[in-house]
């Protein structure tokens, strides 16, 4: 289980290129909200074209580079969020004679939530007196998750009922909040674990709350 967890963690890190190219991490073609109205954005030859929502009237053209000063623009989008979460670190409160501790097993979970993304298009002047387009992005997501994880089961965490040590499989569930800033995504989870074997009633962390660090891989 521990080996499987680390393989999953490496997969998540190696998928950063996929994350950067998904619609939620870039200003892609589609309908967005502004302060005044909904608009449709389309990319043509590196230029962002802003149309009315029905695509009939062009409102603005935002080139990648220009010699003329440009106004800044802000767009936002609300979406359904489906992610695979890795929870590499959990903080467990003290139980019985065991003090509060951090555990580092890798946990995989399926996350479903509601997401809001914000994009700011600004033009920065460079030394050649050209204005280069820059897109800053940040987003928020809140939802619930379920998944499987593993935990060390031994005499210390079973009130002396289990005289041997093994890696127990647990079912995890809870809520999570995720923050995205440009290509960086991180979050916090609040959850509970259930040991999926006959020793669940003796495990001191069974159904006890924990707080974890979250890394996510966007699926949709």
List where the protein language model places each region.
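N-terminal leader/presequence regions that precede the main folded/catalytic core
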Residues: 2-92
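Predominantly the C-terminal beta-signal and adjacent terminal strand-loop region
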Residues: 24, 175, 182-220
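Short loop/turn motifs that connect adjacent beta-strands in outer-membrane beta-barrel proteins
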Residues: 70-79, 118-140
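Residues that define the transmembrane beta-barrel architecture of outer-membrane proteins
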Residues: 78, 102-108, 138, 167-173, ...
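Transmembrane beta-strands of outer-membrane beta-barrel proteins
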Residues: 80-84, 108, 138-144, 184-188, ...
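Transmembrane beta-strands of outer-membrane beta-barrel pores
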Residues: 86-92, 114-118, 146-152, 181-183, ...
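Outer-membrane beta-barrel translocator domains and adjoining extracellular loop/strand segments
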Residues: 94-99, 124-125, 154-161, 199-203
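Outer membrane beta-barrel transmembrane domains
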Residues: 139-171
């Amino acid at each position: 289980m521990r080996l499987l967890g680390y393989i999953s963690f490496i997969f998540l890190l190696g998928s950063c290129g996929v994350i950067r190219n998904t619609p939620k991490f870039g200003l892609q073609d589609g309908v967005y909200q502004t302060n005044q109205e909904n608009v449709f954005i389309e990319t043509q030859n590196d230029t962002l074209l802003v149309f009315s929502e029905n695509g009939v009237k062009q409102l603005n053209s935002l080139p990648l580079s220009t010699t003329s000063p440009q106004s800044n623009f802000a767009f936002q989008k609300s979406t359904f969020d489906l992610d695979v979460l890795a929870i590499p670190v959990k903080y467990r409160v003290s139980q019985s004679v065991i003090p509060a501790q951090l555990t580092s097993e890798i946990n995989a979970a399926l996350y479903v939530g509601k997401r809001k993304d914000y994009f700011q298009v600004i033009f920065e002047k460079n030394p050649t007196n050209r204005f280069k387009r820059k897109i800053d992005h940040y987003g928020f997501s809140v939802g619930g998750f379920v998944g499987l994880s593993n935990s060390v089961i031994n005499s210390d965490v079973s009130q002396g009922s289990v005289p041997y040590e093994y890696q127990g499989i647990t079912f995890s569930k809870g809520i999570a909040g995720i923050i995205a800033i440009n290509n960086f995504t991180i979050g916090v989870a609040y959850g509970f674990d259930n040991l999926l074997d006959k020793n669940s009633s003796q495990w001191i962390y069974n159904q006890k709350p924990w707080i974890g660090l979250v890394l996510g891989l966007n699926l949709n």
